[in-house]
A protein has these predicted regions:
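Bacterial Sec signal peptide processing site at the extreme N-terminus
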Residues: 17-30
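Helix-start (N-cap) detector for alpha-helical repeat units in TPR-like alpha-solenoids
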Residues: 28, 34-36, 69-70, 103-104
Length: 117
């Protein structure tokens, strides 16, 4: 139910999107298979502009694997796009925590924007 409410809020606020140059990240080769599947589907939907379905798929990827930084980055990106910067900040902190050396996460200008005081 909580996810449904988040999805509905996302839908209502998508028109207030802040454009960004960053795009969702692929998962590492060794990532949990169902997490990779949902993440890849999320990226496809993101690229088609279907941000609601992308959010759903990234959320499902996170359910399958809670230790992959790329998933948190992708969820943070979605929250950033909907203007929910406090939630994006929380997710980007988790992305950093689970980055495992991924420079796209560690050197992300978008993450820096949210994490800098």
């Amino acid at each position: 139910m909580k996810n449904l409410i988040l999805i509905l809020l996302f839908t209502l606020t998508i028109t207030n999107c802040d454009k960004t140059k960053e795009t969702p990240l692929l998962l590492p080769t060794a990532a949990e298979p169902s997490a990779k599947l949902h993440n890849n589907q999320g990226i496809e939907y993101f690229n088609k502009g279907d941000y609601l379905e992308a959010l759903i798929q990234f959320t499902q990827a996170n359910v399958a694997d809670v230790t992959t930084g790329e998933i948190y980055f992708n969820l943070g990106l979605m929250q950033h796009l909907r203007g929910n910067h406090e939630q994006a900040k929380i997710l980007f902190k988790q992305a950093h925590q689970f980055a495992n050396g991924n420079k796209k996460i560690l050197e992300s200008k978008l993450i820096e924007k949210h994490l800098d005081p």
